[in-house]
Amino acid sequence: LAAIISIPISVLLGIMIGKLLNRAKGREMITSYMIAFAMDGVYQFFVLFMMGPVIPIIHNTLKLPRGYGIRNTVSLLNMRQSLDNLLAVSVGGVKTPVLTLIIIAAACLFILWFRRTKLGQDMRAVGQDMEVARDAGINVERTRVISMVISTVFAGFGMIIYLQNVGNFPTYTAHTQIGMFSIAALLVGGASVEKASIKNVFLGVILFHTMFIVAPRTGTVITGDSMIGEYFRVFVSYAVITIALVMYEAKKRKAKSAAGLQLAADQLAEEEAKAK
């Protein structure tokens, strides 16, 4: 039910964000940040003030003591690992969530198939150079909106799978945490701002999840406090994203400078040829 409800919401948000980004070409990165902050404020307004007075809440245990708004953490123990347990196989005492793995594999196959379709090729062309794509007859604005819709729908499904696996819902931080960790995992796996692959996803998840396990234990061994490892993990998450953005901007400026020098050299060679 949650997945079904998430689809129209994700589609509407994807269309809205895509249209906003179409009006901010060349400034997509900072615009995306501002949209994220704005939508976070809208979301918190709904869960803090609309839940109860406007949107009815049946279970009083979900409400804040004041009578409206949602508590900081909502327990999902009744549905914890409900998807994982639907088709689980125990191998050597280790439970393997087969259905969840099938869904992940299906998503990967969909992406591989989609990249070979005309729309997938159009998206790739738009991502590489919008002006060249427009000259080739591609509707750049429409393609960007569709790509954003697909992204938000996948993100909604991913959030639902994540929450049912964890078994609790941090009302005011869950959406920011999973987004930050997903970006960091992708970058750790070798992805860049311009390009990412399925290989980067799996490698990043393995490395990042390993850090989740190792960091608290390392903090306990070195300082006697596991929270030091937790702080280190958060630091690495933000540091990886920051370094990736700095490297991307430096690479972009270097390429622009090289193109300018090449253009100047070509013009000089042309003038010398005319002089002869």
Residue positions per predicted region:
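Cytosolic-side transmembrane-helix boundaries in multi-pass membrane proteins
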Residues: 128-142, 213-276
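Alpha-helical transmembrane segments within multi-pass membrane transporters and channels
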Residues: 1-39, 208
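Transmembrane helix-bundle core of multi-pass membrane transporters
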Residues: 32, 36-116, 171, 224-229, ...
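Helix-loop-helix "hairpin" substructures at the membrane interface of multi-pass membrane proteins
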Residues: 78, 90-170
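Hydrophobic core segments of alpha-helical transmembrane domains in multi-pass membrane transport
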Residues: 37-44, 100-112, 151-159, 182-190, ...
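Transmembrane alpha-helical segments in multi-pass inner-membrane proteins
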Residues: 8, 155, 165-234
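Membrane-interface helix caps of multi-pass small-molecule transporters
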Residues: 12-24, 46-50, 112-113, 161-164, ...
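Terminal peptide-recognition signature
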Residues: 14, 20, 38, 123, ...
